């Protein structure tokens, strides 16, 4: 796959940032590293899982960790990984704040910021901004936390079906979407409505044929299990982090916890992990295709 960015550092309409997006297992980081080497860039990770410390195998982190959220991949610096403990929460608004700071730092060095990842809402928030969302309400949260995950899903399904379906297996996001809906009377998507761009950017998204994508995700899931993801999960639990913490709610980790609790076999673990990863990758593919101002690269 050949990738041409049509990017010229001497262009009078110089871009502030480059964005490389796409579904999981599509080769985003590889392309970002190639571009950074050619155009003197640094990567800003846009991945809601790679922000967590101690979880490397299951989030497919690459390169060598240096310090303070900084990694080096084949000589290229990557920012905004390993910045939170597994029990800390993160949001699109927080990502925008952190990414804005890194973009400014990279531009001051005369380099190109290359935002790379598959967390679509973070990318959209960075490029177009967020509509004002209500802050967390302690009283409401206390009430919502008494409900089961299925109950949260059922209630949200009536008022914001898109957010309910998208986050049905993530209790933290279900709770937040319901909280936002109750406090504002609006859906999550309405809060992510398009605005004027915040940056002069070039957005390139890798689109992969579903058959190829399914094969790649299946191979990746099997490789992660064989490479120590089960042991990685157990290590985090042994450190005292709760099995329901933010980081362990992600695909793969929650399946491994079921396996460790002897609720499913290792064979079922791999099957369920692979299936949910395939579905997630397909949703990512669909989401990026629906976004404005994107140039696509096809497998």
From Swiss-Prot:
Residues 47-50, 172-176 are annotated as: Interaction with substrate tRNA. Keywords: ATP-binding, Magnesium, Nucleotide-binding, Transferase, tRNA processing. It catalyses: adenosine(37) in tRNA + dimethylallyl diphosphate = N(6)-dimethylallyladenosine(37) in tRNA + diphosphate. Its EC number is 2.5.1.75. GO terms for biological process: tRNA modification. Pfam families: IPPT. InterPro entries: Dimethylallyltransferase, IPT, P-loop_NTPase. Substrate binds at residues 24-29. ATP binds at residues 22-29. The keyword NADP does not apply. GO terms for molecular function: ATP binding; tRNA dimethylallyltransferase activity. Transmembrane segments: none annotated. It is an enzyme of class 2 (transferase). The keyword Cell inner membrane does not apply. Catalyzes the transfer of a dimethylallyl group onto the adenine at position 37 in tRNAs that read codons beginning with uridine, leading to the formation of N6-(dimethylallyl)adenosine (i(6)A). This is tRNA dimethylallyltransferase. It comes from Endomicrobium trichonymphae. The lineage of its organism: Bacteria, Pseudomonadati, Elusimicrobiota, Endomicrobiia, Endomicrobiales.
């Amino acid at each position: 796959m050949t990738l041409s960015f049509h990017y010229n550092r001497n262009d009078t309409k110089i871009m502030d940032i480059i964005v490389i997006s796409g579904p999981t297992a599509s080769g985003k980081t590889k392309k970002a590293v190639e571009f950074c080497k050619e155009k003197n860039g640094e990567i800003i990770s846009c991945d809601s899982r790679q922000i967590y410390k101690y979880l490397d195998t299951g989030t497919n982190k690459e390169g060598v960790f240096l310090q303070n959220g900084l990694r080096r991949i084949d000589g290229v610096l990557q920012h905004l990984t390993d910045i939170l403990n597994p029990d800390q929460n993160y949001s699109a608004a927080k990502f925008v704040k952190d990414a804005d700071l890194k973009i400014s730092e990279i531009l001051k060095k005369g380099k190109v910021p290359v935002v790379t990842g598959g967390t679509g809402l973070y990318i959209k928030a960075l490029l177009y901004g967020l509509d004002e969302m209500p802050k967390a309400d302690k009283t409401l949260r206390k009430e919502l936390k008494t409900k089961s995950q299925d109950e949260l899903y059922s209630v949200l399904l009536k008022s914001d079906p898109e957010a309910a379906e998208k986050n049905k297996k993530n209790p933290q996001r279900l709770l937040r979407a319901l909280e936002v809906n109750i406090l504002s009377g609006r859906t999550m998507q309405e809060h992510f409505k398009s605005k004027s761009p915040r940056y002069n950017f070039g957005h390139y998204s890798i689109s992969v044929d579903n058959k190829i994508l399914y094969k790649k995700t299946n191979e990746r899931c099997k490789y992660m299990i064989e490479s120590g993801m089960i042991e990685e999960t157990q290590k985090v639990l042994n450190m005292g982090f709760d099995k329901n913490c933010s980081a362990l709610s992600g695909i793969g980790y929650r399946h491994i916890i079921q396996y460790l609790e002897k609720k499913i076999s290792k064979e079922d673990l791999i099957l369920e992990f692979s299936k949910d990863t395939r579905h997630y990758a397909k949703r990512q593919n669909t989401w990026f295709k629906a976004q404005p101002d994107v140039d696509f690269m096809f497998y």
